[in-house]
């Protein structure tokens, strides 16, 4: 019971309390999107005493129009994967997630920091999906690159690789977009919505792959490139999840959670002030409506 209460408290703090506080903490000393995002995300990791360690020789790449492929474990992905790309992440998410976590996902990630784009699963055609990706790459107003969970679903507790979805790999081939894997172990220990658990003092081990380029002289078709990427993903995944990293933690470099890349994009202050006004108004109006309803019922 205590673990369950701790889980719900953590979810509330991460997705409601801290985003709300951050919205009102921002002032004109924090003018840039990535700085604001960094202060929020790094604070979440510090509150949980979650530490990130790079276990690979390669580091995060910021090649033009790169697409990051990350393993999908739990809601903690959205906090940790922001940090491991040096705050250059733009998540692709089902639109339903915006309804489940409106303050964090829609207002905070999408509106303020341009770190989230949405699609409707089962209702977005492949051409429309590709146009969505292309539009965001051509109109990059935040310096963020696409991050995709190519497994297609959360796989907390499943420590073996699966075949990847083909869509974004095919797109990468057609549009000559490089791909980099960022596979992290232990993300779901920080926050796991399937088991209703949240832990502190978690060590997350992060592996950055080399950058894979869709060389059309080497890969004669989209399917050839897919098969290569799929095989590389499985090999990398097994290497990350098959090793005991805790015993070698002293050999790894700790990732700097405040390091940002390309922090040159400014927060939309009129939008921020509008969000503040809406939150304050809701905090006043909603309780007033509830109280009024109780008064009417008691009459």
Enumerate the language-model features and the residues they cover.
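Residue-level "edge-of-site" marker
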Residues: 58, 123, 185
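Short acidic-hydrophobic, aromatic-tinged amphipathic segments that line or gate anion-handling sites
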Residues: 54, 116-120, 214
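Non-catalytic C-terminal accessory region of glycerolipid acyltransferases
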Residues: 132-299
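Catalytic core of membrane glycerolipid acyltransferases/transacylases, capturing the structured
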Residues: 13-25, 48, 62-123
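Structural motif
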Residues: 125-133
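Structural element of the ATP-grasp superfamily
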Residues: 41-45, 81, 107-110, 171-172, ...
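Membrane-anchoring hydrophobic helices of lipid-metabolizing enzymes
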Residues: 1-69, 76-80, 264-275, 287, ...
């Amino acid at each position: 019971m205590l673990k369950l209460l701790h889980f719900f408290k953590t979810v509330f703090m991460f997705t409601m309390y801290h985003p709300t506080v951050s919205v009102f903490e921002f002032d004109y000393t924090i003018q840039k999107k990535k700085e604001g995002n960094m202060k929020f995300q790094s604070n979440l990791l510090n509150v949980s005493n979650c530490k990130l360690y790079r276990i690979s020789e390669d580091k995060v790449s910021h090649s033009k129009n790169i697409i990051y492929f990350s393993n999908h474990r739990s809601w903690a992905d959205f906090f940790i994967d922001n940090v491991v790309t040096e705050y250059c992440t733009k998540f692709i998410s089902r639109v339903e997630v915006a309804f489940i976590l409106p303050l964090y996902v829609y207002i905070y990630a999408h509106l303020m920091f341009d770190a989230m784009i949405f699609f409707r699963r089962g209702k977005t055609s492949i051409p429309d999906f590709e146009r969505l990706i292309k539009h965001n790459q051509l109109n990059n107003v935040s310096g963020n690159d696409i991050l995709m969970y190519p497994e297609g679903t959360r796989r907390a507790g499943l420590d073996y690789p699966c075949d990847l979805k083909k869509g974004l790999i095919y797109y990468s081939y057609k549009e000559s977009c490089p791909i980099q894997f960022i596979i992290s172990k232990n993300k779901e220990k920080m926050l796991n919505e399937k088991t209703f658990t949240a832990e502190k003092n978690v060590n997350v081990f992060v592996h950055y792959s080399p950058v894979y380029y869709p060389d059309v002289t080497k890969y004669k078709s989209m399917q050839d490139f897919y098969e290569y990427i799929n095989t590389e993903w499985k090999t990398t995944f097994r290497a990350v999840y098959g090793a005991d990293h805790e015993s070698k933690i002293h050999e790894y470099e700790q990732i700097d959670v405040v390091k940002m890349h390309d922090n040159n994009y400014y927060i939309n202050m009129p939008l921020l002030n509008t969000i503040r006004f809406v939150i304050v108004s809701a905090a006043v109006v909603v309780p007033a409506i509830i109280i009024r309803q109780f008064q009417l019922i008691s009459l």
